[in-house]
Amino acid sequence: MQRGIVWVVDDDSSIRWVLERALAGAGLTCTTFENGAEVLEALASKTPDVLLSDIRMPGMDGLALLKQIKQRHPMLPVIIMTAHSDLDAAVSAYQQGAFDYLPKPFDIDEAVALVERAISHYQEQQQPRNVQLNGPTTDIIGEAPAMQDVFRIIGRLSRSSISVLINGESGTGKELVAHALHRHSPRAKAPFIALNMAAIPKDLIESELFGHEKGAFTGANTIRQGRFEQADGGTLFLDEIGDMPLDVQTRLLRVLADGQFYRVGGYAPVKVDVRIIAATHQNLEQRVQEGKFREDLFHRLNVIRVHLPPLRERREDIPRLARHFLQVAARELGVEAKLLHPETEAALTRLAWPGNVRQLENTCRWLTVMAAGQEVLIQDLPGELFESTVAESTSQMQPDSWATLLAQWADRALRSGHQNLLSEAQPELERTLLTTALRHTQGHKQEAARLLGWGRNTLTRKLKELGME
């Protein structure tokens, strides 16, 4: 199999230069173009094995170019590149038939590997993707690699109604992802029905899911449709599926197998066509081992797994998320959006965020109301944010350790708006160590220097700098 011919189109000459040399270094023949019109003109006489195209270019953008290429050369794999790493870009690229999606900045070795995979795909004459364009936008934001993986999965599932299991800590945005999977699916125009298993009393879950007949139990005065019937033709999102009682799990498994169920108190089967998206913050494999979750139901639901990372594992997304939530809160309250001081933005990025994206969103709502000025300063942030971060960072330390005390001091200083903490702390640290060492050696400087790991001249200089002569 020959190495392959690659075309690159990007209005950024530096991107063209880097890719051309990297691809040539991998033994591939590379030709570069500045705009989409040049590519279409060249395609009239020859065809590459793969095309890499930027998504935002003057004149014809990457998606418009992709559309024309798919009309003329439907088997040609196209990789869409973009510095604007958002869900809509990923989904639009996949739905118009892109082979894959490459967010900038990219690792050059990964880019070359992706190109080689696309060439192999083309040379083996596999069928392309060709799906209708996307639905409404969502508020899923993420440039972190883990979130790009989530976008990629949503894009690849955009023509499917397969079951999906979403797992992630509380507050990571599992329902947002479920909505996105529904919006970008063939069922987008049908209902999306959500039900949180943890929020429903156990004795009402069956009635909520499957409905009930009139007279099925005390208070059942009319026939009631359950969530399965309400979601017919669409998507049923079962949040916190790990909390579902075992007897209801058995009924759910039967519905997934047969496509029909009986209302509570009913004798006539009700047929439904429903896609199931389930979510949990629990370890379902462990629940299966403990006998708290049916293994056969787990395998029914776990066809495609989507893992949502906690916010602490995607810190690069925090500034963009915070700006977005401040804009949303301002629109809701009819006020001007707050701005984040650069130091505040940096502080938000360092915090623990045990409540994940939901906690960040609520913090931005709080700041919109409570921050005094138009620009949010560090001292405007609620104190509990720092307390949770200190608690997490010192959880492995002894309560009276010097590191714990230092962390608590730094926390108080940052909350008071102090800057240049190191220049403030280092002299005090050295003064404390010197005083203690000299006390330990009864004032013998050479011995104190040895204990501290300094030379005698260094100790003499430090005593002078610190005013301790």
Swiss-Prot record:
InterPro entries: AAA+_ATPase, CheY-like_superfamily, Homeodomain-like_sf, HTH_Fis, P-loop_NTPase, Sig_transdc_resp-reg_receiver, Sigma_54_int, Sigma_54_int_dom_ATP-bd_1. It comes from the Bacteria. Transmembrane segments: none annotated. ATP binds at residues 168-175, 231-240. The modification 4-aspartylphosphate is found at residue 54. Residues 5-119 form the Response regulatory domain. One of its GO terms (biological process) is positive regulation of DNA-templated transcription. SMART domains: AAA (SM00382), REC (SM00448). Residues 445-464 bind DNA. Phosphorylated and dephosphorylated by NtrB. Phosphorylation induces strong cooperative binding to DNA. One of its GO terms (molecular function) is cis-regulatory region sequence-specific DNA binding. Residues 140-369 form the Sigma-54 factor interaction domain. The keyword Repressor applies. Contains an N-terminal receiver domain, a central output domain, which hydrolyzes ATP, interacts with RNA polymerase and is required for phosphorylation-dependent oligomerization, and a C-terminal domain, which is involved in DNA binding, dimerization and phosphorylation-independent oligomerization. Homodimer. Phosphorylation of the N-terminal receiver domain leads to the formation of oligomers. Can also form phosphorylation-independent oligomers. PANTHER family: DNA-BINDING TRANSCRIPTIONAL REGULATOR NTRC (PTHR32071:SF95), TRANSCRIPTIONAL REGULATORY PROTEIN (PTHR32071). This is DNA-binding transcriptional regulator NtrC.
